Each structure stands twice: as C-alpha cells, then as structure tokens.
Amino acid sequence: MTKGGARLSYGEFGLKALANAWVTSAQIESARVAISRSLGGGKLWIRIFPDRAVTTHGQEKTMGAGKGIVDHWVAVVKRGRIVMEVDGVPEVVAKEAMRLAAYKFPIPTRFITRKGEIAG
C-alpha cells in the first residue's frame, strides 16, 4: 500500500493503481497523450514521475564490468496511488479519458471521484 498520494489532491476525477509496478516514462507519456486527445479541455495532473534509472549491459559484456548505462526511467507505483487526475470536464468525458489512459499502463486501475464514490 502506498504511503502517500492515495487521495485526490487537485482534480475532481482520478485514476488509482490497484497493484504495484514500475511504470516507464514512455507509458506515462502515452497515457498523457491519450487523455489530452479525448478531453478537449479541462486540466490534467500527472501524479507520478519517472525518477528511477534502470541500467543495462550490452550482450557482449562480462559479469562484474561495472554498473552499465541508463536504459530507461521508471516510476515506482504502489497499490493505492493516484496516477492521474482530471478536472474541468463532465464525469462521462473524464471516465472515457481515464479508460483510454488505463490501457497504457501495465497495472489494473480504477476510476475514482472526489465524492468518495467508486464509479464503475
């Protein structure tokens, strides 16, 4: 369970993670684009940031040859964390936008509202 970031802070609607995972910067950007295209207006907050570097070695490298180069960046997402928030649009529009964004993440998510009700 997450230590913080489990409640909506900025928007009226949000997308909550239901499992633990590493989310890459490409997945976050893909979800952002999907939401931006479907919203048409309103405000979007991305509540996670890819601040952890994942390093790799080439195939020809031997063991014990150092740390390796940064391959990509990930955000560590814990169960219960709010991933994205939206405000300034009707609930139907926000729900559809979050549904499109949920496909981009490697974890199950749930659409939530500020009223504390779990929507669909």
Language model: regions and residue ranges:
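Ribosome-associated RNA-binding proteins
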Residues: M1-G120
